[in-house]
Amino acid sequence: MILVLAEAALELVPESLWRHPAIVADARRRGKKPGEILLDRARHHVAMAKLDKAERRGRPDIVHQVLLAFQYSLLNRAGRGRAFVHTVGDYIISVKPETRVPKNYNNFVSLMEQLFKVGRVPPEGEALMEARRGSLAALLEELGGKWVALHEQGRAVSFAELGRAVADAVVVVGGFPHGDFENKWILEGAEAVYKIGNVSLDAAQAVCRAVAAAEAALGLI
């Protein structure tokens, strides 16, 4: 399975907020410049009040939860997984299978800030994660131009059928807290769209179940 977390709410604080008192105070506390810290709804709620599309931004915890679920899975450890993150600001983050994502959230935040600043982590030696400018469309084309999507409006299938469908596919999951894909072609151009259960699931919950289904289909569990 190649996981693509799309339109993820992961970005550095935009320049329009650099002078906001909440941003300045948080950056000073951490010994960084305002433009070097991640936008985080939990700490920057007041500053984000007038930010464009604020409801879809500032949730690095979603990316953290998804990568923890995926990178430490049996699927990934068996060499059958690869993860990519497409951010709201059109960055593409590639994550090597051997990458052990920090389990501590604060450490993860620091890692992402370094990644945006340097373009790779670690800064020297073999890169485990790399960030580059790029669109979601370009990434999916690089990955073969075919994908399936997980979405609450998709077709309900059995656990076994889901596993067979996603085990060797490019799987697109939304990485935002509210709303729907802004790129409507994600669902329109997908080979198939599946839903898991009868309620809307958080991204990490959807990924956990898709990964488990793939592991079962591949005989890993």
Curated annotation (Swiss-Prot):
The record marks 61 as: Stabilizes Arg-59. It catalyses: a pseudouridine in rRNA + S-adenosyl-L-methionine = an N(1)-methylpseudouridine in rRNA + S-adenosyl-L-homocysteine + H(+). Keywords: Methyltransferase, Ribosome biogenesis, RNA-binding, rRNA processing, rRNA-binding, S-adenosyl-L-methionine, Transferase. InterPro entries: Alpha/beta_knot_MTases, Rbsml_bgen_MeTrfase_EMG1/NEP1, Ribosome_NEP1_arc, tRNA_m1G_MTases_N. S-adenosyl-L-methionine binds at residues 174, 179, 196-201. Pfam families: EMG1. One of its GO terms (molecular function) is rRNA (pseudouridine) methyltransferase activity. GO terms for biological process: rRNA base methylation. The record marks 59, 100, 103, 107 as: Interaction with substrate rRNA. The keyword rRNA-binding applies. Its EC number is 2.1.1.-. It is an enzyme of class 2 (transferase). The keyword S-adenosyl-L-methionine applies. It comes from the Archaea. Methyltransferase involved in ribosomal biogenesis. Specifically catalyzes the N1-methylation of the pseudouridine corresponding to position 914 in M.jannaschii 16S rRNA. Belongs to the class IV-like SAM-binding methyltransferase superfamily. RNA methyltransferase NEP1 family. Homodimer. This is Ribosomal RNA small subunit methyltransferase Nep1. It comes from Pyrobaculum calidifontis (strain DSM 21063 / JCM 11548 / VA1).
